[in-house]
Amino acid sequence: MRRYIYLLLFVLLVCGGIVTSCSRHEVRFHIGVSQCSDDEWRHQMNNEMLREALFYDGVEVEIRTVKDDNARQAEDIRHFIEAGVDLLIVAPNEAEPITPVVEEAYDRGIPVIVVDRRILSEKYTAYVGADNYEIGKAIGKYVANMRHGKGTGVEIAGLAGSTPAIDRHE
């Protein structure tokens, strides 16, 4: 009987320690992520950001994906501004409709990282993506060399309002 009492006391002590050590998660750094679409590589990027945030106490990552809807993306970015995020990460769907709201976030002092597609302004903290102008130039030279400077080519472009399509065309 005495053994069961000691075992019960031990279990209560352990459970009490677990309960008291489980404090409420305090968010000290809120990251807002606005994704333009939910294709596989963006889905993987989201998972990696969420996984990385697990290594840091107090970091919360909130991801919103708009499935190629400019108006919804602008609304989501405004949501992040009003929520007072500490960092905003934006993968713009199209540059023109998203630029003003990204500028608003930047003007309010929120660091903004633009990913994959640029905006039509320099009002962002950092850009992570390809040099699409150079990519377009290299592809053009490659095709011209293959055709020995003769014939006509056809350009297949991406989303008309996206900066990769614009830059690669130039």
What are these regions (language model features)?
Residues 3-4, 21-170:
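A residue-level marker of the well-folded mature domains of exported/periplasmic proteins
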Residues 8-17:
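Bacterial N-terminal signal peptides
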